[in-house]
């Protein structure tokens, strides 16, 4: 099914071409610049058209091409700001998709195009005055376009993200973060005219307050046909959020069947999965009918594992309700259940059709669970966003939605490059080899985020001891985590923790793999580390 176009217009120098190319690249769509089409059709450059044929001839060519672009073909299109002065051109372009007007201050525009001689409309002694004159002349036409984005102070990446969010119909504080990957053989195909991504090439993480109430139409927009669907949740989340989801799904034509399971990591087992299979069979859930995970990391992992294996795979949707699940477990497609021998030992890669993150759901999250989620955000900063780490270390959480988006962005970049953990995706396991051992020893009374915090400190201590990083770095990381209310030491037996690491799934053969830190924002993979060094790192986080 053909996707609507994303059309960027606005005055010269506002970023139509550069932002358009970035958006097209992120979404895997063709990029078209209307000016390039004009040059190809005229057989001469734009300055030559103006000089030899005059502006009316240029505008006539422009109008003809706008009419041709009226059909939705799934392109990202950059259109000169002069084209949309004509209401007929605006109408034709908007018929093909979402028309967005990019804005910038006259001074910013001059700084971007002031030395470009390929701008016949700016042929004047005082270019700033000419820019202001043209902006005033076109103001009414630009104001007639409902969707605007000011790019004056935005980086290219930030502007592209905002364009994608606007094209997806998200609010001003919303984010649309696409994750593109090569679909493996047998992946359930999907296609939707409302989704921004081409079918079967990836999925999107949508982040915006109030998103749960829009879940039904967002799931349909991701290419899932309305009909019956399974909602897997637990008793706590069901009490707070299930009714809002039910209404949203019903409004979009879905028929939700809710399957409640007990709360807690202790229930992320093959027995619980088998119970869901039996209940799905009794409900006669068919292939193509999606499984929707409404809950934290346990629900997402378990529901995703069941979705990957029920009828050899059905569509899967993640709606995380804990901070930890929002910034980590819901993104990337890793799903699993635990065995008595260790965490996540039986699992699969199951990419979701869409991930819907509603920060408003965190209002019902207990404080300790919120703090546990902050550990994964600190981890994301250490792996790939020094600014995020420094902000958390110095100021603590700022804008919740933006902070979640920052952490998801780090993970999305890694997952796109390595969707099936053949290489650098292992970076995301920073602190987890230590942390999973601590969880296992605690009988899963230690929260995952708390274990990750302790494991990250241990990884930093190991990194410093082996000469990978500045000796002061473990102290900085310990202080940042402690400031956020996370544990920096724990009562356990270091020898038992070392033995428990032998069952960790991240080992290669008999060798344990550790993610070590070079500096904030850069990590590396190391193997064949002596047991004595690992034990010494564990002792650094052991409460005496």
Report residues per predicted region:
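A glycine- and Lys/Arg-enriched "phosphate-lid" helix/loop adjacent to the NTP-binding pocket
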Residues: 95-140
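A glycine/threonine-rich phosphate-anchoring loop and its flanking beta-alpha core
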Residues: 305-395
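ATP/NTP phosphate-donor binding region
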Residues: 177-289
């Amino acid at each position: 099914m053909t996707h609507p176009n994303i059309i960027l217009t606005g005055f010269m120098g506002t970023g139509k071409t550069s932002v358009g190319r970035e958006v097209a690249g992120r979404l895997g769509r063709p990029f078209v610049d209307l000016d390039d089409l004009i040059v190809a059709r005229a057989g001469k450059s734009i300055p030559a058209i103006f000089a030899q044929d005059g502006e009316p001839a240029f505008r006539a060519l422009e109008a003809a091409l706008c009419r041709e672009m009226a059909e939705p073909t799934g392109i990202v299109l950059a259109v000169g700001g002069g084209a949309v002065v004509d209401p007929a051109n605006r109408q034709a372009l908007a018929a093909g998709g979402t028309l967005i007007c990019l804005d910038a201050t006259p001074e910013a525009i001059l700084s971007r195009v002031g030395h470009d001689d390929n701008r016949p409309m700016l042929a004047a002694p005082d270019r700033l005055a000419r820019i202001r004159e043209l902006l005033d002349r076109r103001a009414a036409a630009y104001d007639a376009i409902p969707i605007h984005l000011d790019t004056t102070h935005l980086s290219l990446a930030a502007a592209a993200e905002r364009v994608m969010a606007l094209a997806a119909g998200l609010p001003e504080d919303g984010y649309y973060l696409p994750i593109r990957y090569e679909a493996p053989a047998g992946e359930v195909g999907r296609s939707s005219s409302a989704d921004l991504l081409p079918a079967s090439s990836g999925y999107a993480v949508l982040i915006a307050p109030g998103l749960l109430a829009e879940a039904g139409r967002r799931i349909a927009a991701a290419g899932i046909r309305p009909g019956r669907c399974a909602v897997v949740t637990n008793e706590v989340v069901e009490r707070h959020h299930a009714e809002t989801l039910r209404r949203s799904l019903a409004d979009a034509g879905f028929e939700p069947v809710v399957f409640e399971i007990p709360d807690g990591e202790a229930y992320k087992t093959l027995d619980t999965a088998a119970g869901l299979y039996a209940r799905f069979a009794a409900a006669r859930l068919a292939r193509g009918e999606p499984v929707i995970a409404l809950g934290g990391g346990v629900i997402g992992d378990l529901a995703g594992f069941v979705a990957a294996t029920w009828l050899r795979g059905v569509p899967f949707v993640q709606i995380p309700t804990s901070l930890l699940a929002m910034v980590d477990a819901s993104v990337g497609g890793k799903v699993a259940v635990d065995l008595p021998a260790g965490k996540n030992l039986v699992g699969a890669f199951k990419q979701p059709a869409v991930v819907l993150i509603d920060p408003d759901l965190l209002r019902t999250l207990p404080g300790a669970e919120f703090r546990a989620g902050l550990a994964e955000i600190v981890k994301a900063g250490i792996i790939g966003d020094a600014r995020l780490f420094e902000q958390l270390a110095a100021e603590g959480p700022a804008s919740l939605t933006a902070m979640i988006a920052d952490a998801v962005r780090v993970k999305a970049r890694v997952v796109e490059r390595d969707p099936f953990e053949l290489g650098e995706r292992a970076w995301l396991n920073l602190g987890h080899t230590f942390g999973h051992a601590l969880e296992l020893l605690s009988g899963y009374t230690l929260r995952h985020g708390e274990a990750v915090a302790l494991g990250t400190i241990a990884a930093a201590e190991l990194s410093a001891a082996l000469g990978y990083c500045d000796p002061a770095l473990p102290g900085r990381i310990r202080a940042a985590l402690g400031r956020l209310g996370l544990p920096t030491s724990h009562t356990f037996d270091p020898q038992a923790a070392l033995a428990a690491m032998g069952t960790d799934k991240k080992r290669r053969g008999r060798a344990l793999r550790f993610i070590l830190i070079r500096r904030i924002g850069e990590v590396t993979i190391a193997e064949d580390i002596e047991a004595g060094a690992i034990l010494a790192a564990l002792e650094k986080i052991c409460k005496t």
